[in-house]
A protein has these predicted regions:
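Transmembrane beta-barrel domains of Gram-negative outer membranes and organellar outer membranes
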Residues: 20-152, 157-163, 170-174, 179-190, ...
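Bacterial Sec-dependent N-terminal signal peptides
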Residues: 1-23
Length: 315
């Protein structure tokens, strides 16, 4: 009898232990981890505008962007080798990740339009990062920059290039960047934007709101197709004045791109109707249209370096 009791007791203990182990596994498997979504985009920029992606802490990003002349139309074609003989804008930038959610940068651009020789300071802060369980359904980043022109002042007081004082040289952009990655193939973004220019041409707008939309379609591990569109809310009065008095028609910026990732490099081939690179200019000042062949190809190159890593801190 004692032997039977002992056997039953051992079996009971064994069953209890096994049941407890299985229960622990169930609770562990149902625990919410809130894993953050990575690589909504491969770069901090999409075609022209900002993405919600950030540089990692202590990461330095050296960026070069170039836009050529019209690929087709009156000023393109074979006579300019499809725009490669000309350059509408060039930008060189250094951007740095202070933390995983905060980055700053400086840049110098050729500029396009009335204002040229542009120096930029920028900051971007990520408030939210999407999680795989949709506890946080979207990523949200705030972007702002300040740009100042270093060119000599013009003499026409009705021109944007006439500077009565130093503040007339300055312009600003503020954006909220809202992104969502769907599965592993598709990323979409909305970008409510505000552009302020201290001094503008007669009948132009100092303050302008715009709404941007962009997306990325993953083609392979290293290839992605990009698209980007901005709708500036320019007043009808301003549009009519520039069209009737100066023969200038404003168009909405539309860009397409092919993104290639190779190790620490991200290389993008772009096609866009805007001549400028900075948001301060391409949002309010695009006067070229795809329908007349006034689009240009260009490229963005990003090369990242890690500074002050863990090994450096230990030293």
């Amino acid at each position: 009898m004692k032997i039977i009791s002992t056997i039953l007791l051992c079996c009971t203990i064994s069953i209890y232990v096994q049941a407890q182990n299985n229960l622990d596994k169930v609770f562990d498997s149902t625990a919410v981890t809130h894993t953050k979504v990575r690589d909504t985009y491969k770069s901090t920029r999409i075609v022209q505008g900002q993405s919600s992606e950030m540089l990692r802490k202590h990461e330095l990003d050296f960026r070069v962007a170039h836009r050529f002349g019209d690929a087709a139309g009156e000023f393109g074609g074979t006579k300019t080798f499809f725009g490669t003989d000309n350059s509408t804008d060039i930008r060189i930038a250094f951007e740095y990740g202070i933390s995983d959610n905060l980055m700053v940068g400086i840049s110098r651009s050729k500029g396009s339009g009335d204002l040229q020789q542009l120096y930029e300071g920028l900051v971007k802060y990520r408030l939210l990062q999407q999680t795989t369980d949709n506890l946080v359904p979207v990523s949200l980043a705030l972007f702002g920059n300040m740009v100042i022109s270093g060119m000599p002042s013009g003499t026409d007081i009705t021109s944007a290039a006439y500077f009565a004082d130093g503040s007339d040289r300055m312009m600003y952009v503020t954006q909220a960047i809202i992104s969502k990655k769907f599965a592993d193939k598709l990323s979409l973004t909305l970008v409510p934007s505000y552009v302020h220019r201290n001094h503008v041409a007669y009948m132009d707008m100092n303050n302008m709101f715009a709404l941007g939309a962009a997306g990325r379609l993953k083609l392979s591990k290293r290839l992605g197709l990009l698209a980007e569109y901005y709708y500036p809310f320019r007043t009808r009065e301003s549009k009519d004045y520039f069209k009737s008095q100066k023969g200038i028609t404003f168009y909405n910026p539309l860009g397409l791109g092919l993104e290639i990732e190779t190790g620490g490099h991200v290389f993008s081939i772009t096609f866009t109707n805007s001549t400028a690179i900075l948001e301060n200019q391409f949002i309010p000042e695009t006067t070229s249209t795809w329908l007349q062949g006034q689009f240009r190809w260009g490229f963005n190159i990003s090369r990242r370096f890690t500074l002050f890593g863990k090994k450096d801190w230990k030293k």
